[in-house]
Amino acid sequence: MTLSRRDFIRNVSVLGGGLTLGFTLAAPGQAAAAASLAPNAFLRITPEGEVIVQIHKVEMGQGTVTGIITLIAEELEVDPATVRYKMAGVDDAFADPEYRLQITGGSNAMRVNYEPLRQAGATARAMLLQAASQRSGMPADQLHATLGTVRSSDGKTLFTSAELVTAASQLDVPEDAPLKSAAAFKLIGKHDRRLDITPKVDGSARFGVDAPMEETLVAVVVRPPVGRGPMTSYDDRKAADLPGVHSIIAIDAGVAVVASNYWRARKAAEAITLEWAPGESSLTDSAAIDAALTAALDGDSFASVRDEGEPPATAARQVLEAEYSVPFLAHATMEPMNATVDPKSREVWVGTQAPDLAASFAALGLDVDADEVTVHNQFLGGGFGRRAMPDHVLEAAQVAAALGQRVKLVWSREDDTRHDFYRPPMKSRLKAQLGDNNEVISWQHRLAGPSLMQATVDAMAPAVVPSWVPGFLVNFGADMAGRKDSSSVEGAEELPYAFSHIDVAYRNVETPIPLGFWRSVGHSHNAFVVESFVDELAHACLLYTSDAA
């Protein structure tokens, strides 16, 4: 995405006497036309000179806290260790410019924020320098910012940032605050101290599972063991009389057991028996799913993914074929799924990759509008795509709404493994033709597997479709009509090799098993398949060369 500095929409206001800068990450014109499409992050400098940054891309171990602060601190000329940060709440202004949702995923946090975040720091720096120029009578180009101070060209400290904030907040925002050259970087590419390590070591970091426990009940859910098949009946008589049990109620996902603490809820859950319907699909075991994928590869009706070059006109010296299969995979985040919901204040404490979706699912469970819900996002004990799906938030909201009091819902590790939104299974069949000089004169790749994006849209639909349908959902829905799912074929489509003829095609095979995004998405399986087959081709060429010698 290209964003010029002049298209960098700036708003400035006095907030408690401080300097607050809003800055857009959106494409040109979007912010002015509709604020809901203009993602905003906020840099605030208090009258005391404290720099506060809202982290709108969640921290789940990948370093976004450090990355975001480093970009701003580089241009603002402050020590990143002195910057205070807060996890951003839900706001349309924080929506990702590529996804149109307030979501962290796709490895784009630094890519889409690199220049806008630097611009925010540079703009604040320029305003502080201008304020210093007015107070000192010295030209601004003879002043420079260093470690929260403004100094003259001879190195003399003239002002601290705190002394300039009020005056700076009254200035017009410069249209084109200059960015530093790469040669002048002091932090970018050099600063390697993780700013989230200390709180994680000393225990002050708050994860979703660390939500406040005052007057909070704990819930676990007993679920049907096969997929998400519907429950038909349950027997809770043995569980109801166990110590600490508060309530046992049926929700959409199964039976929620609510108790005074997690252990009592879990022990009571073990005493409940369920009856459930198997569902309509026969594809509920590995053998049946594998057979369906094989049948799809044996058939036709493939959607073309990439077709380049001409098929070879001459016979190949050698033809190689291979078939690869990859299974469902659970994310197995270190921190199990959890969410705490207060139905009275309509607050949610959760570690989520998608705060706005969490608010929508909580609203669905509480039967309120999403804008009435406040999400307190926390550190994530692993995300990997799993925490973009807020099913556990819906469960917690349904239980809290039924009881009328705050509830913390916690999954077990077994829940996490059995009821994940899994990486989809995929089967690939590849065929390559080698020429006389060991060149690949034809590459054919057929893929069969479920549509990850269609499954994701279906899972999100209950909460998001009634009130709004983001453009990306509409686009992907249309994409599915053509039976091509880019999220399932990436890594196979973007083949990096200059083969003479490339033919890649995909066939959608739906299964009833819930699917979700995995780190690297389609590359997770397709990179393995493509590179393994390239290795097989290289091995075949090596053997041919050795034999010829």
Question: Where do the protein language model's features map onto the residues?
Answer:
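Structural alpha/beta core scaffold segments of enzyme domains
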Residues: 1-546
